[in-house]
Amino acid sequence: MRDLFAALVALALLATAASLATTLQAYRRRRGRLRDSERALGRTIVAEIPAGDDLVLFSADASRFYYGERSIDKDLITAVRVLINGAPIAAAVSPRYPEEPDRRPTSFEDRPEGIARDRWDVAIETVTGTVLVECGAIRERVSQELARTVYEVVKDAVGGN
């Protein structure tokens, strides 16, 4: 009886492992198709940003940046800022758009996540509004590197100082 129970438990564990492996393969194929479709459109993938249960691509072509389904015209970008917990720590302003005297640095309301972790974001200010690229609060170095990569690419594109 004990051997039968052990065999059933082993079979259940094998079925669970096979299910997890199949799900992981499907997820990898879906991500691969997404990357391939971005490249087929002539876009360069800058970063894969974790969002919820999936990854959002931040990509670029000659005239635009793409954050998920949103497109951001490079010519309309006025400034880019790195935010940590909603407060700006680095900024670059486009020389195409002179800074207005009443313009204040971008900041967003801090959302406490329950655990003391820093949340890294990049705010891309355009003529039409601000796009917040949420790089996350996974682990400090991971989110920080994602934010730094996005910031540097956008800063280089707008010719900020």
Identify the residue ranges that each predicted region occupies.
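Acidic-enriched, low-complexity/disordered segments with a strong bias for Aspartate over Glutamate
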Residues: 3, 36, 53-54, 61, ...
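Generic detection of short hydrophobic beta-strand segments and adjacent strand-loop junctions
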Residues: 47-49, 72, 131-135
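Extracytoplasmic/periplasmic/luminal assembly and interaction segments
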Residues: 57-86
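Sequence-level detector for tyrosine residue identity
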Residues: 27, 66-67, 97, 151
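Acidic, Ser/Thr- and proline-rich intrinsically disordered linker/docking segments
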Residues: 80-161
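Anionic N-terminal interaction surfaces
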Residues: 2-64
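Glycine-centered tight beta-turn/hairpin loop motif at sheet-sheet or coil-to-beta transitions
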Residues: 53, 69, 127-130
